[in-house]
Amino acid sequence: MEYQGQHGHATDKVEEYGQPVAGHGGFTGGPTGTHGAAGVGGAQLQATRDGHKTDGVLRRSGSSSSSSSEDDGVGGRRKKGMKEKIKEKLPGGAHKDAAGQQQQTAMAGEYAGTHGTEATGEKKGVMDKIKEKLPGGQH
């Protein structure tokens, strides 16, 4: 059986799956890749990089461009939400102290229940909205 190789040359060599094999430069027995690369050097894998070995363990450095936690004002740390992370990256972050104070009062109101939120026109917290949708009356 005669096949036409990659460069139009007639060849009758086939690999184990029946695909034609081009015999260039004395190399024999290698399959042709999907992009025409002979079985030599088709994949460019690098076993080690600059002599560094990690033994399959992912290592992270201790530094990062933005912290995922901040001081909670009571001597501890708390995780930042997505909103705080975005605000931190935006220009004009001079209102950090005012935003921190406002957020603390909003969090206290959010989890405190429905103490006058409808009468004073304040925004309802997430927990209040969820509680309204639950069956079984007002909690």
UniProtKB/Swiss-Prot annotation:
Keywords: Stress response. Induction: By abscisic acid (ABA) and water stress. GO terms for biological process: cold acclimation; response to abscisic acid; response to water deprivation. Coiled coil: none annotated. Residues 49-58, 83-98, 120-139 have a biased composition (Basic and acidic residues). Signal peptide: none annotated. Residues 23-42 have a biased composition (Gly residues). Disulfide bonds: none annotated. Residues 1-139 are annotated as: Disordered. Pfam families: Dehydrin. One of its GO terms (cellular component) is cytosol. Residues 59-68, 99-109 have a biased composition (Low complexity). Belongs to the plant dehydrin family. This is Dehydrin DHN1. The lineage of its organism: Eukaryota, Viridiplantae, Streptophyta, Embryophyta, Tracheophyta.
